Amino acid sequence: MAAPEAWRARSCWFCEVAAATTMEATSREAAPAKSSASGPSAPPALFELCGRAVSAHMGVLESGVWALPGPILQSILPLLNIYYLERIEETALKKGLSTQAIWRRLWDELMKTRPSSLESVTCWRAKFMEAFFSHVLRGTIDVSSDRRLCDQRFSPLLHSSRHVRQLTICNMLQGATELVAEPNRRVLETLASSLHTLKFRHLLFSDVAAQQSLRQLLHQLIHHGAVSQVSLYSWPVPESALFILILTMSAGFWQPGPGGPPCRLCGEASRGRAPSRDEGSLLLGSRRPRRDAAERCAAALMASRRKSEAKQTARAAPATRVTRRSTQESLTAGGTDSKREPLPPATSHEAPGTKRPPSAPATTSSASASSSTSSSKRAPASSAPQPKPLKRFKRAAGKKGARTRQGCGAESEDLYDFVFIVAGEKEDGEEMEIGEVACGALDGSDPSCLGLPALEASQRFRSISTLELFTVPLSTEAALTLCHLLSSWVSLESLTLSYNGLGSNIFRLLDSLRALSVQAGCRLRALHLSDLFSPLPILELTRAIVRALPLLRVLSIRVDHPSQRDNPAVPGNAGPPSNVIGDEEIPENCLEQLEMGFPRGAQPAPLLCSVLKASGSLQQLSLDSATFASPQDFGLVLQTLKEYNLTLKRLSFHDMNLADCQSEVLFLLQNLTLQEITFSFCRLFEKRPAQFLPEMVAAMKGNSTLKGLRLPGNRLGNAGLLALADVFSEDSSSSLCQLDISSNCIKPDGLLEFAKRLERWGRGAFGHLRLFQNWLDQDAVTAREAIRRLRATCHVVSDSWDSSQAFADYVSTM
């Protein structure tokens, strides 16, 4: 009897509290109604009025509300602001209540954006709070504009920071200065433990103060935090100083900027122990060689440069203080100051402000980790102090008043702050000279021969495991820096380089990957490489990568246009270095997934077969736009797959003309090891469809291991669809459970007949059926009836596509 009594007591308490505030709330509701010319509005329901009163006094009533019975609490949840709604989550779950629908409605009403159809949202609370954090940080949302977002007892940034798993920094590094400000220390501490992915999009030129803030932010989030992935997107003209800063910090190197505050966490970690003479070398690995004269010279140059920058920073300090003060004032005005949040009741699991223990510097590096950045030219003293980043490194020769530094006596450049001179020379000639100077730098010679400052003076901490560069053109000095960092980046597990304009720098990349693969503890297992052009044909490049990284598990490579070596008639066509291309056999590797996107032109089948023969563990192969000289060459590839790749489960062909390879297609469909085959836009039924379709169906009926067949874009038509229905007949041993027939000129009457045949054979549910971009809008009633019947047999995925867009395709099939 105790439980019902407690329930009634809580209900009475709720009614008493609500009644005490009802008159005040009613007067506020009625006042505007009397003055309205349109007449009085309908009063809110009594329970809703009571709920509003309780939600407005949650600061006093929170513990009592948490103890309310489930039915009453369920009605109050939609009336709470986002802060109390987030805090009550655990209690609601214990009472069998879900807040997901409330968070979804908040997303629709406040964020006003629709998630991507490809995105599967598992937790709307986390998604909303993460987006809310980003909007508040950038100042793109006014928390005072909606009562559900505004509460003086909470800091929007601090309260939502624990849900942030992915943070995006855009344009002029907005948000970096705010996050490292002293009032937001607890916000940054929370981010250090919750944030996993850091993204940079559409970066623009930034000043020294913004870069200093970013340096502190990256140090806290990567070196002392949990960030494991850094991605850069769409940076058409990268600022070299900023790009190299992001790279070196991601690789685990840390050098406090000139005039910057010391790291509190580093001080706590080193407090209580005497500094070691060889501390720098220990941080870089026990097997690091001793510093030679050139490296000592480079370190001295860096120290000189930092002193000069410290003077500039001191002169710019007043302006910086004004900027930071105005930034903090704007944050305070927006309600984003880090006040101390009210502690939840004793039943809450929340413990805001819990300090993360500082991470100790990593000491597992087993080889030299010096960064390599090319030496830059100092601008004249009368030039503007702002850096002028360029797409390519320019020499200062011929520029009046410019000074060329040579040797150690000249003034140095810091690793993170380059000033470039625009010279009147041709870019190609300058790149060639830089390449001549840089030759051999990645083959074991001293990086100081490039004039690159050594990083031995830097401490090395925790580094990220995933690096992604999308549409970020790499200049020569940026590519050299990346390659030199990669050669000892043993913690890196996944590397993506997409449309970076590597050009001849691909050879330096191969050298660095080869050096990385021999390092003890190398973890690189996934490489994604795509570009417009490549100095190597794609198959030779694939062979070189597989030889350089024999432990690689996933390789995705795409080249959009053929290289010069694909056209021997091009004059001055020089071959690659001898250590990159060789005729020797490829050693056995660990590849499990290989994806290749080919440029136009016939590909040599023997080269592809050599890669497949060495990849005995291959489980997934995807060929995009591959062209072979003859069907026999394609058959040679398929025969190699059957003999050497016995573990292959998934095979995909996209945008390939297989109209003349019907016997090879039948050979694939009879393979009893494959579980999934994709023929996407392969023109399968362009020739002899009446003879080929029955042969194809017969091969599939006898294959009991094939689970998925994808045939989008092959002009199957109604006749082909009805022929495929025979795969599910009673005399078939097929176990097909996924079928994709998108973009196949299928009409509603054909789809309806297909559904009736499946019903007649009674095979039961066979899985998923995809029907995107077919001509189902020509008879909407028949299409709806067909889909209704199909849904009793399988899970149907379709869309409302306008078939008039496919007029040309329709004419071609008349």
UniProtKB/Swiss-Prot annotation:
| Record's compositionally biased regions (Low complexity) | 354-385
Superkingdom to which the source organism belongs? Eukaryota
Membrane-spanning segments: none
Positions with biased composition (Basic residues): 389-403
The UniProt entry's GO CC annotations, sorted and at most eight, read: cytoplasm; nucleus
Which parts of the chain are LRR repeats?
Answer: 489-509, 520-532, 533-557, 615-637, 638-661, 703-730, 733-754
Q: Which InterPro entries match?
A: Leu_rpt_41, LRR_dom_sf
Give the UniProt keywords, A-Z: Leucine-rich repeat, Phosphoprotein, Repeat, Ubl conjugation pathway
Q: Which residues carry this modification: Phosphoserine?
A: 155, 276, 326, 375
SUPFAM superfamilies reported for this sequence: RNI-like
* Phosphothreonine modifications at: 327
- Region annotation (Interaction with Elongin BC complex) maps to 45-54
Region spans: Disordered: 265-408
Q: What is known of its domains?
A: The elongin BC complex binding domain is also known as BC-box with the consensus [APST]-L-x(3)-C-x(3)-[AILV].
Q: How does it assemble?
A: Part of a E3 ubiquitin ligase complex with elongin BC complex (ELOB and ELOC), RBX1 and CUL5.
Which PANTHER family does this entry report, sorted A to Z? LEUCINE-RICH REPEAT-CONTAINING PROTEIN 41, MUF1
Its protein name is Leucine-rich repeat-containing protein 41
Organism equals Bos taurus
